[in-house]
Amino acid sequence: MSVNVSTAGKGVDPNTVDTYDSGDDWEIGVGNLIIDLDADLEKDRQKFEMNNSTNTTTNTTKDCGGPASNGTCSTSALADGLKFASVQPSAPQGNSHKETSKSKVKRAKTSKDANKSLPSAALYGIPEISSTGKRQEVQGRPGEATGMNSALGQSVSGGGSSNPNSNGTSTGTSAATAGAGSCGKSKEEKPGKSHSSRGAKRDKDAARSRKEKHDLLQGHQNGGGGQAPSGGHLYGFGTKSNGSGASPFHCGGAGSGSVGAAGEVSKTAPDSTLMGNSMLVKKEEEEEESHRRIKKLKTEKVDPLFTVPAPPPPIASSLAPQIPPSYFPPSSSNIAAPVEQLLVRTRSVGVNTCEVGVVTEPECLGPCEPGTSVNLEGIVWHETEEGVLVVNVTWRNKTYVGTLLDCTKHDWAPPRFCESPTSDLEMRGGRGRGKRARSAAAAPGSEVSFTESRGLQSKNRGGANGKGRRGSLNASGRRTPPNCAAEDIKASPSSTNKRKNKPPMELDLNSSSEDSKPGKRVRTNSRSTPTTPQGKPETTFLDQGCSSPVLIDCPHPNCNKKYKHINGLRYHQAHAHLDPENKLEFEPDSEDKISDCEEALSNVALECNESSTSVSSYDQTKAPGSPGAGNPPGTPKGKREHVSNGPGPIIGSKTGKNSGKKRGLNNELNNLPVISNMTAALDICSATDSNLTAEMPKLEAEGLIDKKSLGDKEKGKKANNCKMDKNLSKLKSARPIAPAPAPTPPQLIAIPTAAFTSTTTGTIPGLPSLTTTVVQATPKSPPLKPIQPKPTIMGEPITVNPALVSLKDRKKKEKRKLKDKEGKETGGPKMDAKLGKLEEAKAASKDLSGHFLKDHLGKSEGLANGLSESQESRMASIKAEADKVYTFTDNAPSPSIGSASRMECSTLVNGQAPMAPLHVLTQNGAESAAAKTSSPAYSDISDAADDGGSDSRSEGMRSKASSPSDTFSNKDGVVKGHPSTSAQPSQLKESHSPYYHGYEPYYSPSYMHPGQVGAPAAGNGGSTQGMKIKKESEEDAEKKDKAEQLESKKVDHTSAPLQPQHQSVITQRHPALAQSLYYGQYAYGLYMDQKSLMATSPAYRQQYEKYYEDQRLAEQKMAQSGRGDCERKAELPLKELGKEDNKQKNMPSATISKAPSTPEPNKNHSKLGPSVPNKTEETGKSQLLSSHQQQLQADSFKAKQMENHQLIKEAVEMKSVMDSMKQTGVDPTSRFKQDPESRTWHHYVYQPKYLDQQKPEELDREKKLKEDSPRKTPNKESGVSSLPVSLTNIKEEPKEGKRPDSQSVEENKLKNDDRKTPVNWKDSRGTRVAVSSPMSQHQSYIQYLHAYPYPQMYDPSHPAYRAVSPVLMHSYPGAYLSPGFHYPVYGKMSGREEAEKVNTSPSINTKTASEAKALDLLQHHANQYRSKSPAPVEKASTEREREAERERDRHSPFSQRHLHTHHHTHVGMGYPLIPGQYDPFQGLTSAALVASQQVAAQASASGMFPAQRRE
């Protein structure tokens, strides 16, 4: 096809150009183009060079007569369209082209007018669909996606240009396309030639088929556009029919491209049958407006196959600028010699490439639209066996470092089959975002573009897989629907609109680093046929993209969204409609289409799972999720995992078709995110379960099957997942907000256990425990059902970023959980079962809690929290990934990523060092831990996993169920949910860090392995307990029995894997630590930041000190009341206080013994083995857990008590060591990389932990020792408050008296902590709390928390806390507090839950309410738990609850905490931890803890002191 960019175009009307409306093609291009940063830039430059040098807009009127389908010399139209190459009078076009060449995005955005936009759009759109074009499309799409936002013109550019850009047709066409492509296009065009060769091969096949299909189009198109490659004219080069035909040529290819020709596009559009929708171009000429056109085009958007090969008309980048609209109309003949030349050059490939580069140009692009397919080029920094891929990629001229999670192993990405995050977002947008709100131009093409951009990211993830996947990338799924898109798009003009939703999924599959320029286009191989940009290969892609070529229409009455994958639809429904009707649609469709489409996805998931390649869950392009699983088995897991924006679709890849079929359903049911992770894990466990999980989301929307299927099918497999799902279901019910995530949340929810269990099994090499866990999770499955409501929360726009964070958190948690599970293989499953029960019991409570969380999260806090640092920037994207939040939950089960990744940071986790890169990849930049913290989204994952992937799984899932809450609460709460997992990895990762120094041996070995065993169990337990506690009031007895059984079992299991010392610690810790671990972990994870805050913020310090005093008082009261039990609830304030004091006195005795150990824990951490420090922590934690878990674990309590006794002994040892250390002046904490005060805080952490741990045994023992209680109460307070220094009995005895001494220490600590977490606490707490009033409340609270470890611990974002990681925080008094808070959190779930739920929601948002409530609940729950250890728990629980309630109410609003979570790095888990951990995360206890831990992990990751990051 000679690249005759016929001058005919000259005669073409500007309208024609307008009609050409690049929007369509651009969109298509976006679909096909995966933004290749380097490629784009290169192409841009190349194209500019080409255009400038060979500005010859070829007359290329040859094709004018070509397939006369266009009637008039398509060449004319093409020429016109190509005229842009020759900078002639096409003023509008010229501007557009110029802009296009310069910044197509801008042009599209400015949408110059249909005419202007259209000309360039036409040029872009015209870009040949040749194979290269397809590639270009893939590449250009990401940029185009953005461009798409701008305007149709841009869309065309993106669509048509996209392909051509990639294709570059390696000939004049490439150049011409470059010209047409303009800047953005040229970007891609530069590599376009290369693409032409590579892409051409691939695109050629597809494009050629299409070309053959649309050869007549091509004839005209060729005539019209010198880039007459077969593919090229596809764009509607045969737009000649349209009259001017200039636009139509584009139309042919882009479907909308023709639209560029305005009315003519319509004519051409039919010609551009290939483009399918391109035909749909409905005479956009009338709609000359670029945006309108884009919308229309978008709707009509050429089929995903997209034949993006916008004819080569876009001859040269310079041409684009050169060609003015007038030029366009004026010259039908030689648009410009340069164009001709370029076209001629390009023509041979038949891949007419129009560069969409402009759209892709970073300068011209705003934030990428969700669902934009992106081709990322970069370097793999690290890949772990857990499916974490750390990459340094260039996109839009910006370099990104990220962690990609293997979708297969980590399922916390948007549903793989969600056709487009954009669509779902739009649907969700109904909630808060305009449908197209996400699209800058509000053009469907734009959105598609964004979706595909996401897919492009996914491409990176696809890795080598990219080639096969390539086809799936379409502007709107152009690529994605090679089968689907063409037919679907063709079938329904509006399908383009929908298509934008679907393609991202498919794109995601493609988007892998391998996808980059050469491989990216080729990636379609996985997809099989869909290699052609035109999407001719409909079968292959059909399978992946959708069960049938036809897009699945949203059954909702008022919704015309179409999805290639049922998952996309499900996601959309869950988020947008959340109606039972969706459920029907989803279910049948799901079963049907997901069977087909997700079959590949499942396969991919399986493949990914096997190869650890795809992080399906991680695929955050919930919308694009369709292709997500498609990564070939060999695809690096990290690759897939990376694209949080667009990877979701990856799951839907065709690679695993046969295996994926079974899995496809699973995935389908799992709704992609769970699918991959769950599929991976569940693949091991059971495809059916996965299916159910996948179904869960839709069921979630339905609220029917989810529970049933989840409960039944995923019972063993996804106890946690189910749990989450139940919560989701409940949340969903409670909060209809669930926009699109409805389908996903169940996945996410399903994933937690599945991930915890199955994912863990699949994710980490040490998966054995995972499998066991999975089985064990079976009991939880029914309880998981209540979590279903989660989607509702997910629906919250705010949740979007948090969703991403959640996903990452989940992933991390999952990893962590995996590790934890490994270590706690035996214990984990029991925990899981226990969790299941707890979840079941507290599903409702959790739901409420989740609801509150959702509400709070709904507040900007959820967003702030969830959107950590970079998450905020990705908010739109994350919004699109609300689904991903669910996916995060889904991913949460990927402890591999969470655990491994998190632990990776410290490379402490059993051979998890690789995970550190994951952390880095996971956007936790600083160290490995820092790396995981660096990126909010990744940080969440890291932190979540680090903080307690396990709990986060459950809790995080539940949190995810309450999306917003999970957003920060998942950030906070995911971490909270995964305290064990998180703590363990955190510890591991922080094992090098001083916080984990002692903990490393303990937590890393003990906690890590046993801890992992126990952490997942504990994490699960924590999550479970969080849910448990929530439900505890509901099913306190049942839970107690079961939980205790589980706890004892867990203790046994945990103990068995653990070393004796570790065993005792973990056993103790597993029951007490299981929850306390989460909590303490969080506390520890947070505590470091507190110091930073204190140090950094005098105000905070003041407030904190005051608060600390109050808290100590409250804590004392609470500890007493909490220790006291539920029975004393009435008299808790007085009696329990006394009892608590006595108990605390006794306990402080041990605590004091351990108190010296508090510094010692650092030392002993290393020395005694983390066991002793752990014991100290565990003592505090034990107290917490005691109150919290005593209910939960009667048997466990006994076992734990034994271990507590051991721990007490060890604590005494530690106390000696600590004392010597203290006396020696060696700050045990110095062992931890933290300032002395921070270490002091660490001591606090440890001492409370020990106190907590000792609490169960000391409850008995110290009840005996009541004599010692006067002295010990102060001690305990001291231990709790200022364990490190003020462990002396004096401190606790007079709360205030102790305050002076202890407060000196504690104030120092607090100051340190404040310095440490000034931003965190100051922001979260200072802002949140009246310094004096909350302090008074928090005083008892703090006392309960041992000097308010959480406030200190509360600053997980603080490096100290981060370094401490959830593990430290877990054991440390924060642990106690955590259980305290946890208890309130759980307590909230329990008796108080309902009443406190409202408070909790504020709590989540406001520390004040949160703390008061959490404390109340804490007390309540503590009472429940402390029924086992009556005295301390009761008082602590009740009193603390009360005080916490007041305290929290006035202390700080959750918004502040949320804010901190939002600044994940800054606040990390720290911000809401104290209140949030207690009350705010009553429903989200684990989530809060997880979030806190995330912050803590982040703190360590972001440097020892998050304060730096915090600020």
Curated annotation (Swiss-Prot):
Residue numbers carrying Phosphothreonine: T480
GO molecular function: zinc ion binding
High-level lineage: Eukaryota, Metazoa, Chordata, Craniata, Vertebrata
Region (Disordered): 1-20, 49-72, 85-239, 256-293, 416-542, 611-665, 776-836, 925-994, 1013-1065, 1116-1195, 1219-1334, 1422-1468
Coiled coil ranges: 277-303
Alphabetical UniProt keywords: Coiled coil, Isopeptide bond, Metal-binding, Phosphoprotein, Repressor, Transcription, Transcription regulation, Ubl conjugation, Zinc, Zinc-finger
Residue intervals passing through the bilayer: none
Residue positions where Phosphoserine is found in the record: S420, S423, S492, S626, S781, S894, S963, S1097
Record carries keyword Transcription: yes
Expression across tissues: Expressed at low levels in thymocytes.
Bias (Basic residues): 1457-1466
Biased composition regions of type Basic and acidic residues, renumbered to the chain: 200-217, 817-836, 1029-1053, 1124-1144, 1230-1240, 1252-1275, 1290-1326, 1436-1452
Protein name (database record): Zinc finger protein 608
Organism for this UniProt entry: Mus musculus (Mouse)
